[in-house]
Regions:
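Flexible, low-complexity linkers/stalks enriched in Thr/Pro that connect modular domains
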Residues: 1-17, 22, 38, 50, ...
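Short, solvent-exposed loop/linker segments at the N-terminal edge
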Residues: 19-27, 123-131
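Recognizes extended acidic, P/S/T-rich segments that occur
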Residues: 22, 46-78, 152-184
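Acidic, Ser/Thr
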Residues: 33-39, 137-145
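Short, solvent-exposed loop/turn segments at the edges of extracellular beta-sandwich modules
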Residues: 90-96, 196-201
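Structural beta-strand segments of beta-rich domains
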Residues: 28-32, 132-136
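Solvent-exposed loop segments of extracellular immunoglobulin-like
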Residues: 40-45, 147-151
Length: 218
């Protein structure tokens, strides 16, 4: 007679190729994977999802056969809510394992909020004597859920354009940039910045009010 409970590994939030996710962006699916730790025959696994560990208030206990991963479809995420995956195993004798819960996966459905962009490395500048260097600094972008992953900047001769930088350039999480270009006399250059959070939501673009080259002076 088999009276021993089977065992099951702690589930990971996300598909098996993604490891354990802490945050999830906009999606209509929720993926879970786990390890079947028991060396004896498992009859089936069950999974559920709740907003606290062990709870089933989002998805009730559902049979998953002997598969150790599942992608729940038509899953409605709510921004800022943390979802916990729960797993339990049954062996051939009908013994049930203890319930194991993930450490949670928080839905981040919103893009970062934007801040400001100044021309120059301090207070906003209107003119520059440099024929080769453009500088800008920015701050007050924020993402209170998954956090900001990186910033991108672009430089153009019209607000929001990137004809000088030839597209968007990633600058990690730095809050300033100093770049070398060949600048033309009496041309106004604009620096644009956008932020991407840790689930790849992208903020709106913020553009400086422009800095004009002046090589000759008074």
């Amino acid at each position: 007679v088999d009276v021993f409970e089977p065992t099951v590994g702690i589930p990971n939030d996300g598909g098996d190729t993604h490891g354990d996710l802490d945050y999830q962006g906009p999606s209509d699916t929720l993926a879970i994977n786990w390890e079947g730790n028991d060396t004896r025959d498992i009859s089936f696994y069950q999974y559920s999802v709740g907003t606290t560990p062990g709870d089933t208030n989002v998805t009730p206990w559902t049979n998953n056969g002997t598969a150790t991963e599942v992608v729940i479809t038509d899953f409605f995420l709510t921004h800022g809510i943390t979802y916990y995956a729960n797993v339990r195993a049954y062996d051939m004798a009908g013994n049930m394992s203890s319930v194991e819960s993930s450490d949670g996966n928080t839905a981040d459905l919103s893009a970062p909020t934007v801040g400001w962009v100044n021309d120059g490395l301090g207070d906003d500048e209107t003119f520059t004597p440099s024929a080769t260097t453009l500088e800008a600094n920015w701050d007050s972008f924020a993402d209170t859920t998954s956090g900001i992953q990186y910033y991108e900047y672009a430089v153009g001769t019209t607000a929001g354009s990137s004809d000088v930088s030839d597209g968007w350039v990633s600058i990690e999480t730095y809050l300033s940039v100093s770049v070398t270009f060949t600048l033309n006399e009496t041309v106004t250059y604009y620096v644009s910045v956008r932020a991407t959070d840790n689930v790849n939501n992208v903020s709106a673009v913020v553009t400086s009010d422009g800095i004009t080259t002046d090589f000759t002076g008074p």
